[in-house]
Amino acid sequence: MIKTAVATFLNRHLQPSSPLEPAHFTITNGCSSAVEHIAWAIANPGDAFLLGRPYYNTFVPDLVLRTGFNYYKRAFEKAAMGCQRVAGLIVSNPNNRLGRCYSRASLLNLMTFFSENDMYFISDEIYALSAWENEVDRGLEPAPFTSCLSLTSTDLTPDRIHTIWSMSKDFGANGLRIGAIISQSNPSLHKALVAVALYSSPSSASNHIAANILEDEKWSDMFIQTNRSRLADRYGLVARWANTHGITYTAGANAAFFLWADLGSAWKRHNSGTIKDEDLDDFLMKLFLEHKVYVSSGKEFGSESVGWFRIVFSQDESQLLTGLERVSLLH
């Protein structure tokens, strides 16, 4: 029931190059279990997975906590020189931190590279239906969302390409615990996961509720459109706040509910002191918490520069404004 509902729903929304069927799915209790299961199936202890920075920080325990894999190498060549096998790459598309989508060309290039080198490409598309129109950052043309399921090329090895999706973000349903591993050309993967997926199966109640939601096309379409509209509105609110306060942020977001902002530089511009760069994130994090506002530090996500923080803007407008005001007071 749940596999059929998810397949039918995603066929409508992700435009796969070939129709999704129930046999193409392994259902899990969320994307974390899905990531861990795929890693277990395609890699061996000591193997490495590549992650782009900044990355979704929970990928790290998902990949390594129980498997013994290495989660990050700065470059493929570095791993190769160390005689270490790279099992594959995992990407968040849309990106979980920057709120941007990979372009069609970028996805094809990545998928082709990993196919040619006998490695796996894993696309986490948990924000697939949370793309919206950016009407604030003028002059930029963000790439629209493209699912890797919609791409095809003679250069690709389909059995090495896996997709992950969940209702947790697009439907604001973290507690429902419904996730999916999608692999159209690798039945051996699904067969291998039968035993381990036994420990991460959603409840019958979750399956029933999720199927009812996904099968109600009129309601689900309305919900998705309303969500997109509200996310676009909230992004505009936060982006204008950042511009008003001279806070640099990564412009061009058009998906999910994040604004990647350089709060560190803004703080240093208005505060003289002796805070070392390596201590800046922890210092600001402590300061924010003292003023009862939580903003995730880029340090947690492998940020390549200090002082960057992730602002989540999917709250009620009054709560969001209160949080932004508290951040503003610290600058």
Regions inferred by a protein language model and the residue ranges of each:
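PLP-dependent class I/II
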Residues: 1, 5-331
